[in-house]
Regions:
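N-terminus-biased targeting/localization segments
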Residues: 3-4, 108, 119-122
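N-terminal domain-onset segments
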Residues: 4, 12-16, 20, 137-350
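Surface-exposed, charged secondary-structure patches
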Residues: 47-105
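Short, surface-exposed coil-to-beta transition loops
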Residues: 102-108, 318-323
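A short, structured loop/turn motif at beta-sheet edges
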Residues: 84-91, 111-117, 327-332
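Short aromatic-glycine motifs in intrinsically disordered, low-complexity regions
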Residues: 67-70, 109-114, 312-315
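Low-complexity, intrinsically disordered terminal/linker segments enriched in charged
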Residues: 15-19, 23, 27, 86-91, ...
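Core segments of small alpha/beta cavity-forming domains
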Residues: 7, 11-68
Length: 350
């Protein structure tokens, strides 16, 4: 029977047998659907992948392969080899490696026994060995000993910033002739162990993260988001209850106060949350956020421990987003704010 047809798949007596059967069937599907992929017929490709998943995955689980049509097959018998098998309670994790020219791809299959059959519960793809530290040795140095950066005045075009007004629940915001009521949502409480905060995009590697140039006292701080125009408009961490009297750019140790975003997220944590984390654990935590699939998503993550990081959807997606310190009358940080550039009436002087 063609892999493009619907049919009953034989039960797999072992986790390894299921993985090997899936690899072989995907490879056959990839070859048999060359014309579908050439024509970029997404509907037919999606239908074929759905049938493949039905044959090998637990009910409702997805492979993520329906979005991958071009290039060499992601899985190929003989080229993709099992490198580790780990029991995890009732489930089994199988890790594989596939060489594609000069590149290596690593896969993690989570398998679950359903009756007498082993099925794939999840499939994750990595570009580096799965247990490799998220932060390289070279990267660790700039995070462990970051440079302190004095506070400076806001740039002229940002002088109109009103970060406090961004968090007035029910306030009617006006942008471009449209209006939206602001909704303030509590995300959680961020645990800060060292007082060295990191901001950026968690979706890729640590190069998109940077330590901030100011320090705060270790402690636990409430985190909120402002929702407007059906998206996250701002993210803030309240360091104290004292009123903010001035705003300053939250410059980073080796760059300005703007975080570059390529995965549509803004992330904040203490440095202690990142140093011990492996690529596998970082990806699993970030997956919780990615699976929400909501323009208003903001959740706490558990990297090195409970609630030691926060991640939120970044305004209108990829781009560059400014970070600010709100200081009290004594010049001490009272708020850390990320402006998602949605409420431009409150952030842009032009």
């Amino acid at each position: 029977m063609s892999i493009l047809s619907t049919g009953a798949e034989a039960a797999a007596p072992t986790p390894e047998a299921r993985v090997q059967a899936f690899i072989a069937d995907f490879y056959k599907l990839h070859a048999a659907s060359a014309s579908i992929r050439k024509d970029m017929d997404f509907d037919k490709w999606h239908a074929a992948i759905t049938r493949l998943e039905s044959a090998h995955f637990v009910a409702g689980a997805r492979s993520g392969l329906d979005g991958v049509m071009a290039g060499n097959p992601d899985h190929a018998p003989g080229a993709e080899n099992i490198i580790r098998n780990v029991s995890q309670g009732q489930d089994v994790l199988i890790e594989t490696s596939l060489a594609d020219g000069s590149l290596h791809h690593y896969f993690e299959y989570e398998l679950r026994k359903v009756g007498g059959d082993w099925r794939i519960a999840s499939l994750r793809t990595y570009l580096d060995p799965i247990d490799k530290p998220f932060m390289t040795e070279a990267e660790r140095a700039r995070f462990e000993h970051p440079r302190l950066v004095p506070l400076r005045a806001l740039p002229k075009r940002e002088a109109a910033l009103d970060g406090t007004a961004m968090f007035v629940n029910g306030r009617l915001a006006q942008v471009g002739g449209e209006s939206s009521a602001i909704e303030v949502r509590r995300v959680g409480t961020l645990k800060v162990n060292t007082g060295i905060l990191v901001a950026g995009d968690l979706g890729y590697d640590s190069k998109l993260l940077a330590p901030l140039g100011q320090r705060i006292a270790p402690g636990q701080y409430p985190v909120e988001v402002s929702i407007a125009f059906k998206r996250v408009a701002a993210l803030r961490m309240k360091i104290s209850d004292r009123p903010v009297v001035r705003w300053h750019p939250a410059d980073m140790s080796e760059r300005n106060h703007v975080v570059g975003v390529d995965a549509a997220d803004v992330f904040i944590s203490d440095i202690s949350a990142l140093l011990p984390v492996t690529i596998r654990h970082k990806e699993k935590e970030f997956e919780k956020f990615a699976n929400a699939g909501d323009l208003t998503s903001a959740i706490m993550l558990n990297l090195a421990g409970p609630d030691d990081a926060v991640v939120a959807t970044s305004g209108y997606g990829d781009g560059a987003y400014p970070v600010y310190w709100g200081v009290d009358a004594d010049g001490k940080p009272a708020v850390l704010l990320v402006d998602m550039l949605v409420l431009t009436e409150l952030s842009d002087d032009e």
